[in-house]
């Protein structure tokens, strides 16, 4: 009898394991394991961010690396409940041993009900493996659907005739992770709507299940000697959500959990709803500001055992290029244009036609210097300056015409034009023109300054067009 039981158990185990394995092969790509997290070299991440899509749009690992030198990954999912964040934490620790976990608390607030849908469990499970995937799918009310997702061979068995031997190779090695979980959202309207958080007015009772799972997350972090930081990125909060957020922070204090409320930094960040954020999701402009504040907080409050990794650096380089492109695209504020250009690697071309009426003062001079053009533009404002910098280092300049070759591309800059490989660049007729290229010369963005206009013309804009 015992032998029969053992044989039956072994056969059931083999059948279940084989079914789970083949389920991945039978699933179409859109339903298969989506996470690129497993492709990140093991034990290289310094911090992992968990939570809802607010962090996917609101925190940029490229900016954090620029400001701190640390590696981070946004292992979040749409409207991720706290109990799912616990499963995601367990999943994250399978391949990484970070010093810090950052947890978004949006789904502890009442507005989470707006985005709640059973599909959120399926979305989160796509970023998980093993028991964490199963545990998350079993949170579905429809258990039949949960089992179909777990054993998706049941749902997609009709695809058997489309499979080949390559379909059975279940691997994450080739999944690119160069977004690091960040979603690059462009501003859609050039609007500046400044907000202040309301004062706490009413007592709000948080969901007990959320509190229990938050304590489980803290316990798991403590068990692995990992620090835990709760965050809330900026979003348009009503009174009820604000009271709930204050209740979360009160609970955090009571349980010795660190937190950072970015909604308290709106004025310091000059954070504007419209250009920096939609109602809930922050744009790449807003994510930059959030990530700067987070970086400053990390350096002041935590210690990290960072080790450089060539593969991670290579993938971060791609994210930095796409980040810079997004920050400069449609950018009409020269101060931000120059600041962002100075923060990332790239090729910067300057065409400055000297004139005694230029409005260059110390702030503007500093920005030009930070882009690699070490020159006194204040005391030499009458003198022409045509130059090129590469990754923040001056390649060279001249006051009549400057020529150079970078990565096989010829650059000529003079009073009238900027020429790249024999072609005159369009839209470079400003009295001061700055052009930013990525290192591959794949894209470029221009900024023209007319000395007769203000350097900062935010209030003189109609949509994206400025006078």
Explain the meaning of each model-derived region.
Residues 3-24:
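Hydrophobic membrane-insertion alpha-helices, especially the h-region
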Residues 25-44:
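Alpha-helical transmembrane signal-anchor/signal-peptide segments
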Residues 47-51, 282:
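Short hydrophobic beta-strand that contains or immediately precedes a catalytic carboxylate
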Residues 50, 54-139:
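Membrane-embedded segments
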Residues 100-110, 171-268:
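Conserved, well-ordered alpha-helix/loop/beta-strand core segments that scaffold catalytic motifs
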Residues 118-224, 306-325:
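Secreted/periplasmic serine-hydrolase-like ester/acetyl group-modifying domain
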Residues 242-313:
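C-terminal regions of proteins
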Residues 325-467:
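Short acidic-hydrophobic catalytic motif
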């Amino acid at each position: 009898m015992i032998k029969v039981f053992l044989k039956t158990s072994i056969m059931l185990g083999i059948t279940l394991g084989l079914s789970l394995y083949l389920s991945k092969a039978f699933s179409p790509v859109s339903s298969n394991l989506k996470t690129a997290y497993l492709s990140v070299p093991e034990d290289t991440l310094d911090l992992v961010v968990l939570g809802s899509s607010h962090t996917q749009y609101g925190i940029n690992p490229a900016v954090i690396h620029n400001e701190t030198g640390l590696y981070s990954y946004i292992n979040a999912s749409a409207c991720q409940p706290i109990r799912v964040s616990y499963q995601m934490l367990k999943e994250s620790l399978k391949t990484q041993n970070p010093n810090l976990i950052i947890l978004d608390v949006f789904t502890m607030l009442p507005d989470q009900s707006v985005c709640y849908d059973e599909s959120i469990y399926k979305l989160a499970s796509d970023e998980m493996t093993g028991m964490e995937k199963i545990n998350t799918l079993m949170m579905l009310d429809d258990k039949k659907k949960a089992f179909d997702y777990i054993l998706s061979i049941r749902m997609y068995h009709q695809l058997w005739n489309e499979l080949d031997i390559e379909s059975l190779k279940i691997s994450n090695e080739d999944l690119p992770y160069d977004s690091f979980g960040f979603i690059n959202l462009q501003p859609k309207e050039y609007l500046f709507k400044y907000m202040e958080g309301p004062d706490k007015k009413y007592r709000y009772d948080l969901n007990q299940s959320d509190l229990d799972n938050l304590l489980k997350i803290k316990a798991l972090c403590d068990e692995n000697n990992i620090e835990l930081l709760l965050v809330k990125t900026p979003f348009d909060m009503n009174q009820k959500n604000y009271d709930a957020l204050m209740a979360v922070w009160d609970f955090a204090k009571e349980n010795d959990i660190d937190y950072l409320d970015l909604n308290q930094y709106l004025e310091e960040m000059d954070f504007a709803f419209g250009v920096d954020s939609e109602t809930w999701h922050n744009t790449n402009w807003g994510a930059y500001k959030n990530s700067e504040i987070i970086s400053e907080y990390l350096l002041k409050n935590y210690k990290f055992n960072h080790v450089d990794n060539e593969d991670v650096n290579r993938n971060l380089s791609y994210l930095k290029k796409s980040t810079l492109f997004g920050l400069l695209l449609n950018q009409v504020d020269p101060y931000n244009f120059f600041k962002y250009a100075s923060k990332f690697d790239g090729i910067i071309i300057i065409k400055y036609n000297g004139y005694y009426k230029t409005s260059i003062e110390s702030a503007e001079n500093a920005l030009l210097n930070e882009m690699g053009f070490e020159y006194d533009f204040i005391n030499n404002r009458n003198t022409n300056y045509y130059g090129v910098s590469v990754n923040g280092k001056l390649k060279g300049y001249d006051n009549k015409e400057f020529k150079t070759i970078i990565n096989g591309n010829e650059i000529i800059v003079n009073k009238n034009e900027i020429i790249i490989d024999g072609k005159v660049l369009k839209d470079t007729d400003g009295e001061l023109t700055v052009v930013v290229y990525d290192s591959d010369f794949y894209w470029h963005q221009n900024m023209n300054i007319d000395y007769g206009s203000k350097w900062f013309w935010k209030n003189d804009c109609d949509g994206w067009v400025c006078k």
